[in-house]
């Protein structure tokens, strides 16, 4: 049977990947998946995660 609860799987995508124009780096998009509790966190998640394409920590925002 499926789990019941308020936890939902969300995808986080880097916000700086599209705006960066560094020619030495590839134009890949960094994405992470995580879970959040919809009851406690109603707004969109925004976390600092490592982006391997830019080789540094960047802000990742929740996408639909």
UniProtKB/Swiss-Prot annotation:
The lineage of its organism: Bacteria, Bacillati, Cyanobacteriota, Cyanophyceae, Synechococcales. Pfam families: Ribosomal_L33. HAMAP family: Ribosomal_bL33. InterPro entries: Ribosomal_bL33, Ribosomal_bL33_sf, Ribosomal_zn-bd. GO terms for molecular function: structural constituent of ribosome. It comes from Prochlorococcus marinus (strain MIT 9301). This is Large ribosomal subunit protein bL33. Keywords: Ribonucleoprotein, Ribosomal protein. Residues 16-25, 33-42 have a biased composition (Basic and acidic residues). One of its GO terms (biological process) is translation. Belongs to the bacterial ribosomal protein bL33 family. GO terms for cellular component: cytoplasm; ribonucleoprotein complex; ribosome. Gene3D superfamilies: Ribosomal protein L33. Residues 16-42 are annotated as: Disordered. It comes from the Bacteria.
């Amino acid at each position: 049977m499926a789990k019941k609860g308020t936890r939902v799987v969300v995808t986080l995508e880097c916000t700086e990947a599209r705006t960066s124009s560094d020619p030495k780096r590839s134009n890949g998009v960094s994405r992470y998946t995580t879970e959040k509790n919809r009851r406690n966190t109603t707004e969109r998640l925004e976390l600092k995660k490592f982006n391997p394409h830019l080789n540094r920590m960047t802000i990742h925002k929740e996408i639909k």
